[in-house]
């Protein structure tokens, strides 16, 4: 049995539970208990505060955990990064009142900064030879300048709407963060085998996230040019049609290049282009 620690609420909780669901792992409700066992996979889920997850994994109370990179770096616990998961992305930034003229990071010299991430902040300030008074608070960091507690803040930024609603502006992006799968350094061989199975499922889901399955009818006269346009995993699938002048072409495309490639396909005479999402992809 492998024990995974995950955040008990919030955006990372939702993203993590969605990932586990997409891997086919069934997890019961967490509303009444902190530890839930899967009904179809050797996994039990331990629900914790996000800032407790790194230590819980490092100490071996949990074997692995899914946690924000910001918390992992801040806690500096002795655990391995098993995989970057690419979701729950945010950044940790310095922000100050909108009305303030900001010349650069030297503005913070002698100022007070409120934050829940003092260790990351101290490293950044030391790298930039800036001396400040760091005021550590947990939660509602964004209100600190408005109530006179600090001159600026160092906090998580996602959309930036919280800063705007508190009359603040982002002036320095210090760190980019995403969800990480972290692991204890001393897993048994049995638990490593379960983790490998879990990783196989997770990677199959993540790889498919930005891919589209595309089918089209293509004129055989332009088939060579169409095949060159399609990146594909290896080469596209070509299927004959009743009309000998045409064939059906199937391929997998990266979503970020999708519209550019579709435009080229249409210019080469492709018709009836059908696009479907991919739930999982096993390479």
Each model region followed by its residue ranges:
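Active-site-flanking structural segment that lines cofactor/substrate pockets
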Residues: 37-55
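Small-molecule-sensing regulatory modules
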Residues: 1-43, 69-80, 84-91, 99-283
């Amino acid at each position: 049995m492998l024990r995974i620690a995950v955040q008990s609420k919030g955006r990372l909780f939702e993203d993590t539970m969605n990932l586990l669901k997409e891997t086919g792992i069934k997890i019961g409700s967490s509303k009444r208990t902190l530890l839930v066992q899967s009904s179809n996979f050797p996994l039990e889920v331990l629900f914790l505060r996000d800032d407790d997850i790194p230590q819980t994994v490092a100490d071996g109370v949990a074997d692995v955990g899914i946690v924000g990179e910001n918390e992992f770096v801040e806690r500096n616990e002795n655990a391995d990064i098993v995989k970057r998961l690419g979701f729950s992305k945010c950044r940790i930034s310095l922000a100050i009142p909108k009305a303030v003229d900001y010349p650069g990071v030297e503005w913070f010299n002698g100022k007070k900064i409120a934050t829940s991430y003092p260790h990351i902040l101290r490293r950044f300030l030391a790298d930039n030879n800036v001396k400040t008074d760091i005021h550590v608070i947990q939660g509602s960091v964004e209100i600190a300048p408005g109530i006179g507690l600090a001159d600026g803040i160092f906090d998580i930024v996602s959309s930036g709407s919280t800063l705007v609603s508190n009359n603040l502006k982002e002036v320095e992006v210090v760190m980019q963060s995403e969800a990480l799968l972290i692991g204890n350094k001393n897993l048994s061989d049995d638990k490593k085998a379960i983790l490998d199975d879990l990783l196989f499922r997770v990677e199959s889901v993540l790889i498919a996230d930005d891919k589209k399955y595309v089918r089209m009818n293509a004129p055989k006269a332009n088939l060579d040019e169409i095949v060159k346009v399609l990146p594909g995993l290896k080469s596209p699938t070509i299927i004959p049609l009743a009309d000998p002048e045409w064939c059906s072409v199937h391929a997998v495309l990266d979503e970020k290049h999708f519209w550019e490639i579709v435009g080229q396909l249409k210019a080469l005479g492709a018709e009836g282009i059908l696009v479907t999402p991919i739930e999982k992809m096993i390479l």
